[in-house]
Amino acid sequence: MIFVITVLSGGTGTPKLLQGLKRVVNNEELAVIVNTGEDTWIGDLYLSPDVDTVLYTLADLINEETWYGVKEDTFYTHEQLKNLGFDEVLRIGDKDRALKMHKTYYLKRGHKLSEVVDMEKVALGIKAKVIPMTDDRVETKILAKVDGKVDLLKFHDFWVKRKGDVEVLDVIYENSLYAKPCEKAVEAIKNSDLVIIGPSNPITSIGPILSLNGIKELLKDKKVVVVSPIVGNSAVSGPAGKLMKAKGYDVSVKGIYEFYKDIVDVLVIDNVDKEIAKEIPCEVLITNTIMKTLDDKVRLAKNIIEFCGSL
């Protein structure tokens, strides 16, 4: 039987699955370890975009049109800052800004990120555990060729400012060799009956989590299911395909298996890729992985739990 579940998540793809999981499992036995490689400062404001997306998703506040920020938010402060000549890289809503101000206030007073996120999840009425991958600074950067010159870009410069329209040479997890995973993250994995790696970008959303000391070793001792973010030969959303190519992986479910082969026990792939299943050297669950409706999300969550519970 599967009672305790830990999910590894970025800010896209996996939150849709979380909407399904929160409706089919005991939320108090659900933990979500979230990528912080895209955390950044904009002026004096600390942003933890993937963490905030997970918080909003579990609190039923997420803007499902963008999968970033709060639904029906306003942007008066962002627009006024722009009028004053301060152009934020990310478009931050007014309600969303309050959460970021809360983080900033406590981080500047010496609190750990994981402590602040715990305060926020309680305030938002979330029963599941939401855990930043680390309390240390890890930053995902994109080595790219820009206007004929090699440059090291922050992720938001690459994806938001430049729309990913550069030649990617490599992806680097800056400082991950020295960062420690959150103790709560380690504890969550150890206590899990099942670890689900959601359909987030493997390179920039899950890769930073796996790069932390000891995480892969912990996962090798657990039952790990990976939900492929690739359907056919393209990513469901975001720059996963482009970044997988840059890291030398085929943009296919076979490429996803290769990326996770040291830890994966079950690979979940879409019906579109059923002919490839026999080429994957691990257990494979073939199902609909495209999550357009809440029913799709709940059905996928149930299918994963039932399939893994039978192994």
Curated annotation (Swiss-Prot):
Keyword flag Oxidoreductase: no
Principal EC category: transferase
GO molecular function, one term: magnesium ion binding
One of the GO biological process terms: F420-0 metabolic process
Binding site for 7,8-didemethyl-8-hydroxy-5-deazariboflavin: D52, R91
Presence of the UniProt keyword Ribosomal protein in the record: no
Pathway: Cofactor biosynthesis; coenzyme F420 biosynthesis
Catalytic activity: (2S)-lactyl-2-diphospho-5'-guanosine + 7,8-didemethyl-8-hydroxy-5-deazariboflavin = oxidized coenzyme F420-0 + GMP + H(+)
Temperature-activity note from the record: Optimum temperature is about 37 degrees Celsius. Thermostable. Still fully active after heating at 80 degrees Celsius for 24 hours. Activity begins to decrease after heating at 98 degrees Celsius for 30 minutes. Inactive after heating at 110 degrees Celsius for 30 minutes.
Keywords: Magnesium, Transferase
Control of this protein's activity: Inhibited by EDTA in vitro.
The protein's required cofactors: Mg(2+)
E.C. no: 2.7.8.28
Protein task: Catalyzes the transfer of the 2-phospholactate moiety from (2S)-lactyl-2-diphospho-5'-guanosine to 7,8-didemethyl-8-hydroxy-5-deazariboflavin (FO) with the formation of oxidized coenzyme F420-0 and GMP.
Subunit structure: Homodimer.
NCBIfam families: F420_cofD (TIGR01819)
Entry similarity comment: Belongs to the CofD family.
Name of protein: 2-phospho-L-lactate transferase
Naturally occurring in which organism (per UniProt): Methanocaldococcus jannaschii (strain ATCC 43067 / DSM 2661 / JAL-1 / JCM 10045 / NBRC 100440) (Methanococcus jannaschii)
